[in-house]
């Protein structure tokens, strides 16, 4: 089967990593995959997709975004040429800005078998009527990355499996998967009494709650001198966070790693005992399952898909969104109870297997075979 995957950008984000997982799953399933990037891309990410066995077509020669009617015409011409040359059996659209436009264009150009995946919950959309129209009249399957997200879009949710009944129009949940560079630990993680490392592995942006991390760490540092903070990532909040650390007198206890290659992340997770995810919006929480796979105890905000991924009190802890005091309280409960921390870590290692690449690949390959 020949499959066209379309995506607005190929940069360094969770959506690109999960779409790369999709490519790997389909190629391993014996399918021919063409990935079309409309706008921005990095040569490194394009190379990752090519190394996974897909053909990559970047429509924008300058890696720039084109808006308005010019953008619509640009997409129409690009997609028309690809459909003429490649003749795919199925198109799989990653639903991000420019949203439904590529879906309408593919339908206009005669593409009937269309799958759409949205990588967020419905809270970022002011109006869902367009998405409901797309799901009911334009695509065969609309997939979401958590059941909470699916319910927020459509009012009901179903986790897809091979026994799921397919209708003419469908919506399901298929969970994201661990990337190939992160493996589930076979041995239990050990926790030291002498030094405890809190960590963030994230884009350093306000939407990820990064402005809350240093204030929370500074409050804890006053009582727990053994703790340190490892910051992996970069973004617009980095300078702000560094200024906070200096102002609050904790900069000597913070290690700034900057943006890291995917291949380096596993060893960095292994240095983290308690992984912080104070996001203001989170469709799934890929960082959470990556951390759990390495035995980290995740402390995350109660927002978006995180409560579904981080089972509160079972494999990690949740705190109220934008609440530094509650975040501090949850971390403190771990620092005060080493036995509980170890148990949550062990539970996480068992629990995270449901997000394995094998399960993800089986689900999507089965879905493709059934709708073609």
Spans of model-derived segments:
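Conserved donor-binding/catalytic core segment of Leloir-type glycosyltransferases
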Residues: 4, 190-208, 214-217
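N-terminal strand-loop element at the rim of the active site
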Residues: 5-13, 17-73, 162-167
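Aromatic "clamp/platform" in nucleotide-sugar-dependent glycosyltransferases that forms part
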Residues: 280
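Conserved acidic donor-binding segment of nucleotide-sugar-dependent glycosyltransferases
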Residues: 312-313, 317-324, 333-338
